[in-house]
Amino acid sequence: MLYVRDKVNDIYSHSAEIRSVSEDASKPVRTMAVRMVTPTPTQSNEQIVVNVPNVRKPVPLFILMRALGLVSDKEIIETCILDMGKNKDFIDMFIPSVHDAGKIFNRTNALQYIATFTKGKTIPHVLDILSNYLLPHIGEMNFREKALFLGHMTFEMLMVARGMKKPTDRDSFRFKRVELPGTLIYDLFKEYYTLQQRHVFQ
């Protein structure tokens, strides 16, 4: 379920957040968020950043998109707003994010940049994070599909930022996650099985 919020905190003005569950039941739930930086009296900000699991620092949107294989600014913006003609009013909202990507214009540099904020500090480690930790419900090596979903999250957030959509009402039953009995029993069994293993090996 995608949750879009406004007035997040002093650092971020808007965010789009999702809990992503892999089809592989052995893998834990991963949480990811796309956020817009709040303007300050001295800086206009409003660049878009992404919180990626196992990456210590929020990654600028355009750098993450390049790491996923989309290189040009136009291709990245089209992935986010889909129709450049119909949604041309949104294009200017990406200007701070274009500048935020700095001098990183290709995939290799993007992967190297992200690697500096990971434990492994290598490109293979970053690729492992993008495969297994970023939006695992989409699949492991489906980088193009992950970029499209990331673009969808960004567009939903921008529409709330422009007042074209309301933020998600988390109290509404429409947005409540219903856990099925099988899932609940699996989680309970896993918890007690882990405890039993600890007692056995003590």
Language-model-detected regions and their locations in the chain:
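N-terminal non-catalytic structural scaffold regions of very large proteins
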Residues: 1-202
